């Protein structure tokens, strides 16, 4: 009996039958003779199955992969080779035991411990130009969980023998894998059947060929897609798929000689919009003009150009001109005194200054009648944007001014300054165009495309009345999409209410937000404000993004870019991305943390829920360590879990968290995400705060033009005996307070003149103020609160500044001696960078750091308080108290300089054991009250409290509980505050019981009352 044999490959071993043998006689005879290279492993159809580890010789040099080959000896005269090359190049799997414990599971991201059985998926190596394969490792359970969710047509493990290396496994692992295979098969019983195996053919020379002409054996590079998501382009025709044609609908319908194109009519429209305070009325006025025109017989102007000019602050063009330069150039054109124009400019409106002096000019009078068109104005603005030399700019301005009336020129100057002063934004203008125009513009930032699609839809309606088509909202590649934003979240309960479906909690990276656009080999990077990002921050990403997204030829990514330390793997602080700062960190890389994908391979993903977008991102992106990485994100469904995360983030000194609804779509420009930062919690109790002196002021702009509305804040340096600048503060005052401060503040106008900067002030040139205080020791003290203390070399207080400053209180009870000085400011900065001993608990709405409260511990106002825990203050707390607490000042005021993350010596709360859901509220409150440390409101306050005071025992208990010191009557001279008569200590401040309760309610010291 002669021997015949059949060669199988792992994917088709069980699927093929004897009928599928392809006859040949001589080609593999050499392999059959070398029995010593084969070992018996199993039986197939009752016949012995042999395994050969070396590749079959006849396959060497062919396109087939080298792998374990199965040989079956069968009785008969025929021999055969099965499985065509298409099947042989399919996805492969292997199995072994982890050798070093360094490889991570591709699914769960955990390290696979040394000696643990693991399954590998053999995939093309995207990091090698020469091709080749690499292995993605999984835990056994993780692999089958991934296969369970894979598409029905995806290759799955159907038999143990399909795993290369299975014969080296222990029996336990074999049984475990076999059980997983059985479970997978039962769950996939209802899925579509696998496509039939393509039969291979043999040529007379023994070469394997495909019966399909031109069949390709190259593995597809298309992106992987998860079940239930079909990434197919929308062929509705609404999305911009090609460049806008040269002859647009907007310009084709325009009659340049019609008065709707005159700048005069445009000015009238702006004036009407500005005169109406109602936003709905503003929109209606613009809508009427775009539909009916100035004569009421229909609009005959250029819709796109009109809308574009109505939005100079949105569609911005750089003209390289500031207010002083404009005044300087027009003083030459009008032949008038530049100093007079500069003084008038202090009123805050450069366009009004130009109008006034244009009307007064004798040598260059305005035109008698306005005949300029908006097309001519647009051409002038385009020309001006290309000029950088003063002489050229002056000539261009002179040319256009010679044809302008005074009001025409005023309007043009406002267009140059990107502010028509209509008190209306893009939404009010675009809503007049179409109800969906604003949303479409936010998504694509392509105004011309939006206008063209609106006009196209209007044409369709004219042809087929009643068939109105809604304007689609689509992203436009290589054009920045307005980023989705986050609103402030002040409590855990508010977050749970806003995200009822659960949320993704993501670390808020302290970097710079970047929107990445890729179209083939072309890349664009846009900042949060939609401006191009500086090249040194993003230039190298073009080398790594193709590796991270091997299947993506076009995409839009939402991400954060920051500098990451290669040794520790931790991000470096905000501001280190600058050229000079980055040079100081030699062992650091600029890393892109990707947290969203809104466009991929010509498909917009904005209308997909976040959970699907995140899954899509993980399926299509490969992390490149310290270059392109996923942002850290965790799914949260319980309030206690969220509270724990907030606590951990604040304790680690990170910026905060961003919370996103798992079902939320990507809404450009909408604040539908939530951000949690320490200065939002507990009504700002965790914010960085300092008491600073008002050293100078600056003129405001717009509605605050001509008045002091921005203030230069600083502190005293005892070492140099000079005053240093800390920050510029423009927020915190309402209009009434600002109006009052114009008269209350003692200021001297110096108009940023360097020669008038006093010797006692250390200030850099960029912060020369318009006004300066004559004597800083008599200046006002304000409490300035910000997100955090930061480093800014532009300020002279040892480079310390405050990020996002605002004035939270005018400290009438303090003078320059009791304000924060430079050594104290340095201490506050150091404390703010240390880990905060702070715990967030899931309590009532608006009290994210206080949890609950028991009725017996409520003050007269009903504010929640609790008993002081019997814990000793930490060493750092004592140190801070010793450095910053001055119990007595010359005028009797208490020193209350505040630290950043906490008030000095203050612990908002200690860690408490989590309360299980379902326990009674009272029990939870008692637990929190037993473990929580009170605010140190009265630190440094020494109070004489007469025993005859009504409610004496209760006042004493609360005052001492909040870290106050009571003095006896014989020691009244050491008191800083006295309740009652001050005869024995006139220097002490006289207070009342209401003052104690007011301090407890507001959680800080208030002015004596």
Curated annotation (Swiss-Prot):
GO molecular function, a single term: DNA ligase (ATP) activity
Modified residues (Phosphoserine): 210, 216, 227, 242, 913
Record-linked Pfam families: DNA_ligase_A_C (PF04679), DNA_ligase_A_M (PF01068), DNA_ligase_A_N (PF04675), LIG3_BRCT (PF16759), zf-PARP (PF00645)
Targeting signal (transit peptide) range: 1-42
Keyword entries, A-Z: ATP-binding, Cell cycle, Cell division, Disease variant, DNA damage, DNA recombination, DNA repair, DNA replication, Ligase, Magnesium, Metal-binding, Mitochondrion, Nucleotide-binding, Nucleus, Phosphoprotein, Primary mitochondrial disease, Transit peptide, Zinc, Zinc-finger
A biological-process GO annotation: double-strand break repair via alternative nonhomologous end joining
Tissue specificity note: Testis, thymus, prostate and heart.
Zinc fingers (PARP-type) by residue: 93-185
Catalysed transformations (reactions): ATP + (deoxyribonucleotide)n-3'-hydroxyl + 5'-phospho-(deoxyribonucleotide)m = (deoxyribonucleotide)n+m + AMP + diphosphate
SS bond list: none
UniProt keyword Plastid, yes or no: no
Name the UniProt record assigns to this protein: DNA ligase 3
Organism, as annotated: Homo sapiens
Name of the gene encoding the protein in the UniProt record: LIG3
